[in-house]
Design a protein with these regions (language model features):
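Histidine/acidic residue-rich metal-binding segments in metalloenzymes
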Residues: 1-160
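His/Asp/Glu-enriched, well-ordered alpha-helical/loop segment
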Residues: 58-86, 132, 153-154, 158-160, ...
């Protein structure tokens, strides 16, 4: 903590071992740090490359069920309840995951979560073999997208985060199954959020600032995310 560490993360690789996750939460809680997990059951994800459902079947793509994410979220929320540690769910995409987070918050578990702009504006109906839309977690169904938006409205979701994962055009210019997961996010996040959430009247500007700046700083325990005398001039 003194050296500047603000959180513990698996860096995009799910912590499949429940005991390891328990220990991480126990030790991180000693330093008031959250554990950020890429929630995904590797055995359920398998070699999938798109959300498991009608559109993946039509395109002949191997699917990743929403349960691959929500099962891990349910586990981590339970471990957070057991240990008293702070769980932060990264780039949530499944309505089942949202239900697990809401249930945990209702029980007083220290759990926060985030959603990406692309999971708020796109669905698996957009795929059509476009490798630029291959990401992990994958684009989900309309019902999942709508649940994420509602989670922002009712306060269940704490943060909008980019999950910025760019790749060179040559890396994406291959078959869908062979392309790397990842999509750009930094340069599109604010315009998308303003266009789809502010200008439609879905969220207020103050709520958007909270989701993009204030709450991320709070989750990480940083003196940032606002403009106040004597505080760091850092709102991102």
């Amino acid at each position: 903590r003194r050296a500047g560490c603000v959180a513990v993360s698996d860096d995009g690789h799910p912590v499949a071992d429940s005991l390891l996750m328990r220990r991480a939460l126990e030790y991180a809680s000693m330093f008031n740090m959250p554990v950020i997990n890429h929630c995904e059951d590797p055995s359920l994800k398998g070699d999938g490359s798109a959300h498991e459902g009608y559109n993946a079947s039509v395109l002949g793509l191997r699917g990743i069920p929403g349960a691959a994410e929500s099962i891990m979220v349910e586990r981590d929320v339970s471990l957070g309840e057991l240990t008293g540690g702070h769980v932060h769910v990264a780039h949530m995409s499944s309505r089942g995951s949202l239900r697990a987070v809401q249930s945990g918050k209702d029980r007083g578990v220290s759990v926060t979560c985030e959603v990406t702009p692309h999971h708020l504006v796109l669905t698996d109906e957009s795929l059509s073999y476009d490798t630029n839309l291959k990401m992990n977690p994958p684009l989900r169904e309309v019902a999942d997208r709508d649940a994420m938006i509602q989670g922002l409205v009712d306060g269940s979701i704490d943060v909008i985060a980019t999950d910025h994962a760019p790749h060179h055009a040559d890396e994406k210019a291959v078959e869908f199954d062979s392309a790397p997961f990842g999509i750009v996010g930094i340069e599109t996040a604010v315009p998308l959020v303003l266009d789809r959430l502010l200008h439609t009247g879905t969220l207020s500007l103050s709520r958007i600032i909270e989701l993009l700046a204030v709450n991320p700083a709070r989750v990480l325990g940083l003196e940032a995310g606002g403009l106040q005398v004597g505080k760091p001039a850092d709102i991102t």
